[in-house]
């Protein structure tokens, strides 16, 4: 009957709903596309089809559908948040924030707006703004939507605090994520590596890093954390073994940090030439990352300076550290800049 009477839009809408509930995405898509052929301005069909395209990772198509909805009806509030979410997945944080600002101009503040804004600011390495928005999101959720405050939410908040060098607060928040989800190994590794990286609380770092490795033993980032923990503990042979295993796990996508760590371990074992080779690999990878950098990244620039300094290129190291310091002035960076100036 529907094939003979394509104008029966209500029937098609009901069928699309039934197919979606039965996880028959292809059949639902056919019905929604048929509705849009008959009535291209059907907001609901466009919105639902945008969600399907998003779930299929067809992000450009999803964004186009949500944008069309908003052109047809600027008061269609959920479309703003769906579009903002797609822009986040596309790694377009500035466009995410622009979409959220339009929503803010018309609607009351809500959790998802502030949460997405926090994630977007984190992507732009604007960590104080990220923290501000995530805390507002938490406050809004506590008042009306407490189920939104998941382990993932607190992981994002904890990571923002860590990136802003507020380590004690990051520690508290990341532990909260783990309390909510006791096997959330991503947060365990993040917390453990944070302490190992700044060479503090190594016993606690060991607890979390070892547990993360038990839960996901083939995760290269976790193996790197284990190797770096051994390095901080002065176990340089054990460190090298784990770090080389991490590099093997990442052989198809080499990681600058892993190769820098391997170089550090080799240097401690008296293998200066091999260390230099690893640092050069790390440097090459970092320079590639720098070329792709769309917004200033203090962490990347600091690491670049570290590797350049290890390779004896103090002038370039200082320039990179200076750029990092201008983005996020920290005491460790100030000391590095001062030590290089003293050597000269």
Regions found by a protein language model. Give the residues of each.
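Helix-start (N-cap) detector for alpha-helical repeat units in TPR-like alpha-solenoids
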Residues: 9-10, 43-44, 77-78, 111-112, ...
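Register position in tetratricopeptide repeats
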Residues: 21-22, 55-56, 89-90, 123, ...
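Structural marker of alpha-solenoid helical repeat scaffolds
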Residues: 4, 38, 72, 105-107, ...
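Canonical tetratricopeptide repeat
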Residues: 14, 48, 82, 116, ...
